[in-house]
Amino acid sequence: INVRNFKAALEELGFSETYEVALGADIGAIAEAHHYVNKVTTGELPFLLTSCCPAWVKFITDQYQEFIPNLSTCRSPQGMMSAVIKEYFRDPEHAAGKKTIMVSVMPCTAKKAEAVRPNSYTHGEKDTDIVITTTELIRMIDNFGLDFATLDPEACDMPFGFGSGGGVIFGVTGGVTEAVLRRLNPDHSKETMNEIAECGVRGEEGIKEFTVPYK
């Protein structure tokens, strides 16, 4: 089961278009890489903390306020993607007379809280209108009696139906850091990308130390 199967199921459920949130992760990786260069390499900050997880951001802001300046100012992939899509469909030519309702499918309930935060609004309107968890989506699919085996897989819709490998690995342990490191490194050859992947950034150890090539 992959995103193409879910695209087919979502269409049966009545969703008009389905996009790939990995693109939002790509935008976030680019933004965090710029933030790192502007703040950490200049010496303004000693380190940078990712802001892609709303539960993590709330933990820092509630329990460790001294680290708030070290939090990236970037939105999460959900926030990035929703803002881009809503802005795209503000163009009357793209909207084609229809109102855009942005529904985000996410694995974590913290994304529901993120969607109603003031910084998740643009022009006074919510960027993400509704958030459903992956568990809730599976229940919807079951309740509608849909069977993945009988659905023809479909590609996500354009122009936002794609994402790079860096965006896809956001969901694994160490993936955000690796995606940012890929963006920071000017050499994007397969050899260098493999070196970054194998440097120790991935894994479930509590504290990880590693060096990466910069060519």
Feature annotation, model-predicted:
Residues 1-215:
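Iron-sulfur-associated redox domains of electron-transfer enzymes in respiratory
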